[in-house]
UniProtKB/Swiss-Prot annotation:
Function: A positive regulator of the alternate pathway (AP) of complement. It binds to and stabilizes the C3- and C5-convertase enzyme complexes. Inhibits CFI-CFH mediated degradation of Complement C3 beta chain (C3b).
Outcome of swapping residue 351 to A: Decreases Complement C3 beta chain binding
Disulphide bonds in the chain: 32-56, 43-72, 57-75, 89-127, 93-133, 104-111, 132-170, 148-184, 152-190, 163-174, 205-248, 209-254, 224-238, 269-306, 273-312, 284-296, 327-370, 337-376, 350-360, 391-455, 395-461, 407-439
Name of this chain's protein: Properdin
Result for mutant: residue 275 to A: Inhibits oligomerization
Oligomer and partners: In plasma, properdin exists as dimers, trimers or tetramers in the relative proportions of 26:54:20. Interacts with the pro-C3-convertase enzyme complex (C3b-Bb) comprised of Complement C3 beta chain (C3b) and the Complement factor B Bb fragment (Bb), where it binds (via its TSP type-1 5 domain) with C3b and Bb. This interaction stabilizes the complex and allows it to become the active C3-convertase enzyme complex (C3b-Bb-FP). Interacts with C3b. Interacts with CFB.
Gene Ontology cellular component annotations, sorted alphabetically: cytoplasmic side of Golgi membrane; endoplasmic reticulum lumen; extracellular region; extracellular space; specific granule lumen; tertiary granule lumen
Glycosylation sites: 83, 86, 92, 139, 142, 145, 151, 196, 199, 202, 208, 260, 263, 272, 321, 324, 382, 385, 388, 428
Species this chain originates from: Homo sapiens (Human)
Main location: secreted
Record-annotated TSP type-1 domain positions: 28-76, 77-134, 136-191, 193-255, 257-313, 315-377, 379-462
Name of the coding gene: CFP
Segments of this protein annotated with the region Disordered: 219-238
Length: 469
């Protein structure tokens, strides 16, 4: 696998490159992609279909889909994706709950906790978008009618009312309209003046190419009907002409449609391991399109999958650091509960390196100076309440959330640095071990006080990939 910041695999010249659209061998055929986008979980750079997962994942930087639009899985070792954003709160007012998830993605292995690829892990937390819920208001009585909107013929008049009986609260509103209208008649006849309707479309030119026996022309017309002038009382007629004509200008020469030339040679396979993609090209020049003629139909390029049958290098990756060893000092039986600095170490393992990939960068062992407070009785103090934890179980019945106060030890005031060897400077010293803190009893407890609450309006856990189907 190519980790972030690592160089791309070295490309070695193979003894033979195979150009193919090969039938898949081994597992069912999949769609193979050249890139897996960690931020979105989507496959990028479609290489082609009809290949097996094993062939696609010769390059661990690639990714695959079992069907178009399906779940994208990277070819690297499985690990957990980023957490999704929190879903909307299950209620719009008062207290509710919301979910988020992450997925085990990868191939040929398991995520931490022995979880299979494709498995979802959920988190549930309490939420509150708005403290109060909206309360509807009530309308006042209708006000008086306003004057008619016109001075002749028929119009409308309006009356209004206020949303204040009572006023709405917390974003509520009054149902219905704040005003209403009705027809009104002035008993006076208005004159209607004529107005042109919009111009109709231009008629087609008599020819589509220039150079014909007659000069092409186009015409359009309009009607005095928007509205027509009234007779009693008399309205004014429409000003201007009812039609107009013009010459057709700028007509192009008759078009020549383009045609494809022959396909060119197939390009070499661009990779030396895993799958690649070759290309053929052709040119729209047989003939070249002219005078607005249509371009050649179809694609100017076509691609094929090429298989080097060579696995790509896989760089090593460090496991997580192991636990710190006990804090000891050479030639001393025990330094616990004493102002005597010692040393401790932890290690890690470089795993997964194959096919001449890069070795893990960095040290395999980490050493630090320490004071041992293992099983030391120390005076303690109660911490403040922790923040509320996640709702557990996120997908089970009756989830609850909890917070705690802990009896935390007060560490001894030993020197924070030591000089173990003269001339090598000061070294930081870390406290190590599990002390035995002692606090005054709180709510009947000596070490941990816990408070629990139920999570409200809990939504169901649903796979987002299934919701898209």
């Amino acid at each position: 696998m190519i980790t972030e910041g690592a160089q791309a695999p070295r490309l070695l010249l193979p003894p033979l490159l195979l150009l193919l659209t090969l039938p898949a061998t081994g597992s069912d055929p999949v769609l193979c992609f050249t890139q897996y986008e960690e931020s979105s979980g989507k496959c990028k750079g479609l290489l082609g279909g009809g290949v097996s997962v094993e062939d696609c994942c010769l390059n661990t930087a690639f990714a695959y889909q079992k069907r178009s639009g399906g779940l994208c899985q990277p070819c690297r070792s499985p690990r957990w994706s980023l957490w999704s954003t929190w879903a909307p709160c299950s209620v719009t007012c008062s207290e509710g709950s919301q979910l988020r998830y992450r997925r085990c993605v990868g191939w040929n292995g398991q995520c931490s906790g022995k979880v299979a690829p494709g498995t979802l892990e959920w988190q549930l937390q309490a939420c509150e978008d708005q403290q109060c819920c909206p309360e509807m208001g009530g309308w006042s009585g209708w006000g008086p009618w306003e004057p008619c909107s016109v001075t002749c013929s028929k119009g409308t008049r309006t009356r209004r009312r206020a949303c204040n009986h009572p006023a709405p609260k917390c974003g509520g509103h009054c149902p219905g309209q704040a005003q209403e209208s009705e027809a009104c008649d002035t008993q006076q006849v208005c004159p209607t003046h004529g107005a042109w309707a919009t111009w109709g479309p231009w008629t087609p030119c008599s020819a589509s190419c220039h150079g014909g026996p007659h000069e092409p022309k186009e015409t359009r017309s309009r009607k005095c009907s928007a509205p027509e002038p009234s007779q009693k009382p008399p309205g004014k007629p429409c000003p201007g002409l009812a039609y107009e004509q013009r010459r057709c200008t700028g007509l192009p020469p008759c078009p020549v449609a383009g045609g494809w030339g022959p396909w060119g040679p197939v390009s070499p396979c661009p990779v030396t391991c895993g799958l690649g993609q070759t290309m053929e090209q052709r040119t729209c020049n047989h003939p070249v399109p002219q005078h607005g003629g249509p371009f050649c139909a179809g694609d100017a390029t076509r691609t094929h999958i090429c298989n080097t049958a060579v696995p790509c290098p896989v760089d090593g990756e460090w496991d997580s650091w192991g636990e710190w060893s006990p804090c000891i000092r050479r030639n001393m039986k025990s330094i616990s509960c004493q102002e005597i600095p010692g040393q401790q170490s932890r290690g890690r393992t470089c795993r997964g390196r194959k096919f001449d990939g890069h070795r893990c960068a960095g040290q395999q062992q980490d050493i630090r100076h320490c004071y041992s407070i293992q099983h030391c009785p120390l005076k303690g103090s109660w911490s403040e309440w922790s923040t509320w934890g996640l709702c557990m179980p996120p997908c089970g019945p009756n989830p609850t959330r909890a917070r705690q106060r802990l009896c935390t030890p007060l560490l001894p005031k030993y020197p924070p640095t030591v000089s173990m060897v003269e001339g090598q400077g000061e070294k930081n010293v870390t406290f190590w071990g599990r002390p035995l803190p002692r606090c005054e009893e709180l709510q009947g407890q000596k070490l941990v006080v816990e408070e629990k609450r139920p999570c409200l309006h809990v939504p169901a856990c649903k796979d987002p990939e299934e919701e898209e189907l």
